[in-house]
Every structure is written in C-alpha cells, then in structure tokens.
Amino acid sequence: MVEKSIVQEAKDIHLAMELITLGARLQMLESETQLSRGRLIKLYKELRGSPPPKGMLPFSTDWFMTWEQNIHSSMFYNAYSFLLKSGQCTGVEAVIKAYRLYLEQCPDQSGIPPLLALTRAWTLVRFVDSGMLQLSGCNCCGGTFITHAHQPRNSFVCSLCQPPSRAVKKRKLSPQSADITSQLLDEQVRRAV
C-alpha cells in the first residue's frame, strides 16, 4: 500500500481551491491534482455552493480560430509562453499566472464572464503542446497569434490587422450599446413615419 504524503495532499487541496476559484472544470482538477474525484466534488461544492458542471471538455481547435476568441487566446498564450521562457514557473502554475494576467487585461464587465475560461485556456496549452495548434507571426503587425499547426510561413494576417466585417459592426455598437440601440430605433421610427 502506498502511503500518501500529507504535505502533497495539502498542496493539491490548495491548488484545487485556486483552480476552482478561477473556474476550472472537474476534468482539469482531476488531471492536475492527485485528489480523488469524490474529494474534488466535495471541495467544489464547498467553495462554489453547487456541484461541478457536467459534460465534456472542449475538444475542437476551431473555437480558437474565430476572430475574437483568437485574440483572447493569443493574449493568454503569449503570457504563458513568456512565463515559461523566463523560467518563472512551469506547468499548471504557469497556466494560473498567465490566466490571472489575462484577467487583468480583460476585466469582468457587468457580470459578463471573460471570453476565455480557465479550462479552455488549459485546453489551449494542451493543444499547442500536442502540435495541433501553434503560434504564428502576423505579416502586418509582427504579433504572434494562435493558428492551426503547420501554418505556412509568411501567410498569416491576424484579425486585428484584417478584422472580419462582423467585427466592425460589433465595434460600432459596443461603446454605449444602450444609447446607440435607442438611437438606431429612433432612426428606424423616423424612416418608417
């Protein structure tokens, strides 16, 4: 029988608490700690007041390729990559620190959760590590962005340099959407009358 280390268990509980606080799903907790599923569910209920959400983890790389998600994913992954290269941290600790940096840059806006959830950020790291995704440089701005693996060199233009038409529409409506929406409705009423 293998004896469990009390110190390791305490570290795992602390890590699980931090991950749960940041919004990690149960599958991520099971993968990153040595705690049993039952203990993780108990801990999750204690911290969140409800059982962990059920369902599969995101498994498609396509989510990271759409324009807005790509910008957020790239911002997170560049922070993660910097932390690894600088030797400040590794593994799940680097994911947590990079995610906290991402949250600082994309603060919670009136109850709307951040576009990139912690579990999705963790999945992104796994996709890059497995060679399904990579960082590629933009031909226009020189920034590095998440792309499908084996993206041909010098062929990528990011969605900041070349935004899709729907991005421009969203930007026009976003500054004061309540005010703009009422103005648009007023214009439509004037045209109809």
Swiss-Prot record:
How is the cofactor bound, in the record's words?
Answer: Binds 1 zinc ion per subunit.
GO MF annotation terms: DNA binding; zinc ion binding
Q: Does the keyword Zinc apply?
A: yes
Task: Give the location in the cell.
Answer: Cytoplasm
For activity, the cofactor(s) needed are: Zn(2+)
- Read off the Pfam families from this record: FlhC
Query: Is Zinc one of the keywords?
Result: yes
Q: Name one GO cellular component term.
A: cytoplasm
Q: Where does Zn(2+) bind?
A: C138, C141, C158, C161
Q: Name one GO biological process term.
A: regulation of bacterial-type flagellum assembly
Q: Which UniProt keywords apply?
A: Activator, Bacterial flagellum biogenesis, Cytoplasm, DNA-binding, Metal-binding, Transcription, Transcription regulation, Zinc
Matches recorded under InterPro entries: FlhC
UniProt lists the family membership as follows: Belongs to the FlhC family.
Query: What's this protein's function?
Result: Functions in complex with FlhD as a master transcriptional regulator that regulates transcription of several flagellar and non-flagellar operons by binding to their promoter region. Activates expression of class 2 flagellar genes, including fliA, which is a flagellum-specific sigma factor that turns on the class 3 genes. Also regulates genes whose products function in a variety of physiological pathways.
Under the subunit heading, UniProt states: Heterohexamer composed of two FlhC and four FlhD subunits. Each FlhC binds a FlhD dimer, forming a heterotrimer, and a hexamer assembles by dimerization of two heterotrimers.
Name of protein: Flagellar transcriptional regulator FlhC
Source organism of this protein record? Yersinia enterocolitica
Q: Which gene encodes it?
A: flhC
